[in-house]
Amino acid sequence: MSEHVRTRSQSSERGNDQESSQPVGSVIVQEPTEEKRQEEEPPTDNQGIAPSGEIENEGAPAVQGPDMEAFQQELALLKIEDEPGDGPDVREGIMPTFDLTKVLEAGDAQP
């Protein structure tokens, strides 16, 4: 039996100082087992159906056709108006309150 030994000088003579990215030995590719496939795939039978049997709408309804751009603009406006803290109670707090008696008295006063 003869032993073949590769030396560093042989690889540098070829101009290939980098080690090969090819794996040495055999590579075994394992397919996922049936149990793992079932865990990875979400159930498709009852997606979007609530326990009560009603269909849940996630997000905005699908709109197709020429009205798509108008729908997207309207949806953008609704999102802006529905920002947290923009409810009617907040708007009332921002509006100034006037004491009508003081306003009327100020209007009747003469310089």
Swiss-Prot record:
Pfam families: GAGE. Keywords: Phosphoprotein. Residues 8-24 have a biased composition (Polar residues). The modification Phosphothreonine is found at residue 97. Residues 1-67 are annotated as: Disordered. Belongs to the GAGE family. This is Putative G antigen family E member 3. It comes from Homo sapiens (Human). The lineage of its organism: Eukaryota, Metazoa, Chordata, Craniata, Vertebrata.
